């Protein structure tokens, strides 16, 4: 467990030292988490599974909430004040990260910075920017793709945030490779 836990915790905290507030630190930690897991390993999620194998997992019934009825695994990533969750689906190029508490504005700013740092051969395409209210709780959804000419496979990054302090999740990102046929 220490093989993955120590590097992951270092990655989560390396930039946090410079954060001006707890909200910024939480957003920075969340951003570091999905950058160092979902984005970094999107082309080889089996390698990410191997790195996560020693972290605790959610029981199947609780993991189902994060897996949208798909088969996969949800790992608990220790973090204060609350742990993060990393989810990988078994049969899809799909990785997601969840934060119970995070500053929506900071998470969105850091997400946009990450989207605009796509490798130079990719074109960045914004595909969604919507706000909706469900049961009195407002959420904001942003979606971007990194596209290559003549390539049907497109890394897609969907961020959803909420400013509602009662929301079960204030930030989550889904990172998946989709094809033109999907």
Describe the role of every protein-language-model region.
Residues 13, 31-32, 89:
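Processing junctions and N-termini across compartments
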Residues 7-15:
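Bacterial N-terminal signal peptides
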Residues 74, 82-89, 153-163:
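Broad, structure-driven detector of short, well-ordered beta-strand segments within folded domains
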Residues 1-4:
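Positively charged n-region of N-terminal signal peptides that target proteins for export
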Residues 20-85:
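N-terminal leader/targeting segments
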Residues 79-141:
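Long, charged/polar, surface-exposed segments that mediate recognition or autoinhibition
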Residues 137-182:
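Glycine-rich, aromatic-bearing surface loops/beta-hairpins
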């Amino acid at each position: 467990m220490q093989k993955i836990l120590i590097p992951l915790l270092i990655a989560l905290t390396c930039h946090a030292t410079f954060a001006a507030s707890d909200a910024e630190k939480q957003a920075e930690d969340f951003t570091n988490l999905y950058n160092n897991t979902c984005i970094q390993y999107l082309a080889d999620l089996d390698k990410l599974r191997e790195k996560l194998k020693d972290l605790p997992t959610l029981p199947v019934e609780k993991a189902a909430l994060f897996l949208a009825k798909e088969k996969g695994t949800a790992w608990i990533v220790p973090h204060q004040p609350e742990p993060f969750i990393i989810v990988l689906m078994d049969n899809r190029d799909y990785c997601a990260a969840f934060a119970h508490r995070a500053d929506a504005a900071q998470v969105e700013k850091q997400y946009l910075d990450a989207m605009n740092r796509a490798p130079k051969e990719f074109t960045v395409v914004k595909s969604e920017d919507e706000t909706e209210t469900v049961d009195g709780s407002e959420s904001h959804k942003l979606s971007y793709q990194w596209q290559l000419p003549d390539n049907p496979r497109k890394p897609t990054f969907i961020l959803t945030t909420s400013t509602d302090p009662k929301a079960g999740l204030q930030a989550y990102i889904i990172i998946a490779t989709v094809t033109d046929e999907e």
